[in-house]
């Protein structure tokens, strides 16, 4: 069973528009042919990014010249996907799969695939790969790479399994995606899960197993169960997002960028990106590079990605906020970038840092120890230059420098680190070390003391009540940390605090944090209640509401440092010691009292040694 007559009429594919027409035709069907589309994309990517030299020893292969926008008068060459080439690759893949899997040995009751059948298909793909190759190399994600080079990356293996299952007529097997891993779901309602590929350094022994253990340990790799369960159209979107336009470390293929952008807009118009936050972020990045007339601007698309994560995935995804923060960072919008990074840390704080979460750790490490320090350093230089030469700087430059005079920017920075510290609590692996502390102190020092003191850090009433409870520190530790260690995958995520609020009357800016979880802020209603209660108490006059942002820390480390953070002078040694101490030691020995007592007693304990 090969290509259908309607599919054959669309060949040869001589241009980007021809490829888009093929995708549009397949997306109009109930079951778009994943094998065909992946082979076409892999073919085009190979000759536009991997091997751009026009081969002379392949008589069937030709290139279609067309005018190039840059330089003017130049030509660009598009590899012509001839029917004979694609049909031969298609026949080879389907014959290999159907010849290796005997469906009569795996009864499918009610048309539902069994775990043994899914495992068998994954074995066929797995055993067809080369025994030795660099698994993270570029351009090995498509079925073209699988057929012509017997190489696939991790997510490519999962996609190949789904494509093979479709070729076998197993319509209940679909791709499941987190932000750094892929597996399959199957069954009548997709309730069954199965590992089919490796992650990181490899986990071959997990193939065929469920992902329940990863969900239960609350690792980011499995998103606490809030992962994407794809249908066929979203699987097409996945292969489009997987297009790698890079020719080398410094050059991208303009043709592949244009192809990816047009295909993503096609999927967007058909509504197939609504449940795909990372695809929306990918499209927004492409629009920032080359805007499409009459289309939404990148900022709108970034916020659509965040809205998708909130609507369909309990706001448990990290990268929608990372995309937004990256956009603001590139455009030197310091305040908005810090806010988006703080929102990112607010999401991660409800996870446990596990061994296989190294990719998101690298992201946060780079942001905290490279991107933010350099962004604030640049802002400080602009602020200093503006003070020396007032009136000479552009408005945008002044706004970047003035971020260091904005207490809300400082509050966002604290909220970012509070989320990281909370992420570490209850995790089997420590997150913070002295490298983090060094750059935290450096970033804090970019803000003047009077700016830092405008941030009001308050304690929750629950902490005061906890200090009065008769049972000991061990019981409090167990109650605080127990749910993070013993949460079940079906439990809903814990409720979170409202987003960062400025003084009374201030509105929440666009791109603000998720309302259900944030690193501790006090809402206007709560502050109003506290103020009215204070007014009823016998006092000469009612206390005015705070002018600056009000912040409530969620992590024990940041609670212990709250007076150090807003002090006139920064005690770098104390902050470094506090930040790098193990959470288990801190939480077990701490006596809940005033913040200053907490900090000093903790520092003394470290000097003596444990």
Swiss-Prot record:
Subcellular location: Nucleus
Taxonomic classification: Eukaryota, Metazoa, Chordata, Craniata, Vertebrata
Role, per record: Essential component of a MLL/SET1 histone methyltransferase (HMT) complex, a complex that specifically methylates 'Lys-4' of histone H3 (H3K4). Functions as a transcriptional regulator. Binds to the TERT promoter and represses telomerase expression. Represses JUND-mediated transcriptional activation on AP1 sites, as well as that mediated by NFKB subunit RELA. Positively regulates HOXC8 and HOXC6 gene expression. May be involved in normal hematopoiesis through the activation of HOXA9 expression. May be involved in DNA repair.
Location of Phosphothreonine modifications: 594
Gene designation: Men1
Name of this protein: Menin
Chain positions found as Phosphoserine: 487, 543
Region feature (Interaction with FANCD2): 214-390
GO biological process, one term: osteoblast fate commitment
One GO cellular component term noted in the UniProt record for this chain: chromosome, telomeric region
Main location as per UniProt: nucleus
InterPro entries hit by this protein: Menin
Biased composition, class Basic and acidic residues, residue ranges: 484-500
Disulphide bridges: none
Induction of synthesis: By TGFB1.
Tissue expression profile of the protein: Widely expressed, including in the pituitary, brain, large intestine, spleen, kidney, adrenal gland, ovary, testis, thymus, lung, epididymis, bone marrow, pancreatic islets and placenta.
Stretches the record annotates as Disordered: 460-552
Alphabetical UniProt keywords: Chromatin regulator, DNA-binding, Nucleus, Phosphoprotein, Repressor, Transcription, Transcription regulation
CDD domains hit by this protein: Menin
GO molecular function, one term: transcription cis-regulatory region binding
Subunit structure and binding partners: Component of the MLL-HCF complex, at least composed of KMT2A/MLL1, MEN1, ASH2L, RBBP5, DPY30, WDR5, HCFC1 and HCFC2. Component of the menin-associated histone methyltransferase complex, at least composed of KMT2B/MLL4, MEN1, ASH2L, RBBP5, DPY30 and WDR5. Interacts with POLR2B. Interacts with POLR2A phosphorylated at 'Ser-5', but not with the unphosphorylated, nor 'Ser-2' phosphorylated POLR2A forms. Interacts with FANCD2 and DBF4. Interacts with SMAD3, but not with SMAD2, nor SMAD4. Directly interacts with NFKB1, NFKB2 and RELA.
A Pfam short name: Menin
Keyword DNA-binding: yes
